[in-house]
Amino acid sequence: MFLAFDDTDSLESMCTTFLATELIKALGVYDLIGLPRLMRLNPTVPWKTRGNGALCLRLGIGRGEPTMVGELDDMPVYSYGRTAEEADPEFVLTVAEDVISRLARTEEGASPGLVVSAAKPAQRFYWQAVRGIVEKTDVLQELQRLGADLVGWEGGRGLIGAT
C-alpha cells in the first residue's frame, strides 16, 4: 500500500521528511516495504515550498530479511524487500489524515495532499512533476482510475506531488 503526501510545509516551517518520520511512528503496526521515496519536484513552480519535495512510503507486512534503515526515538527502523501482506488502506488513510491535519502548516499557506493507493500512478506524472507543471485535473483523473483514496486540505494542491 502506497502512502504519498506533499505540500505540508511552508516557506517558514515544517519539513516533509520530518512528517514522514511521524507517519512511520504512527503507522508502526506496519513495516516499510523498500525505502521511503523522496521526490524533488520542479523548483521553478510559483507555489513551491521550502524543499519542494514529496514523499511516498510503501507499507505492509514485510517478508524476508529486514534491513535496518535508520532510527526513530532511539528505536531501529527496518525495511523489507518484499511484502507478505498489504496494509489496510482505510487504517492508513485514517491515521495519516490525523497526523497531517495536526502537523501541516495550512495556516502558513500549505495546501496538503494525501494519497493512499494499492497501485502506482503512471510514471509520466513523476517526470512531469520533476520537470514541468502538472494540472490537478489530470492528477484527479489518474487517481480515480487507480481507485486511490485521497484527501486534500486548503485546495489540495499537494495531491499533484503526492501522485
List PLM regions with ranges.
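Conserved mixed alpha/beta catalytic, RNA-binding, or beta-rich assembly cores of soluble enzyme
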Residues: 1-163
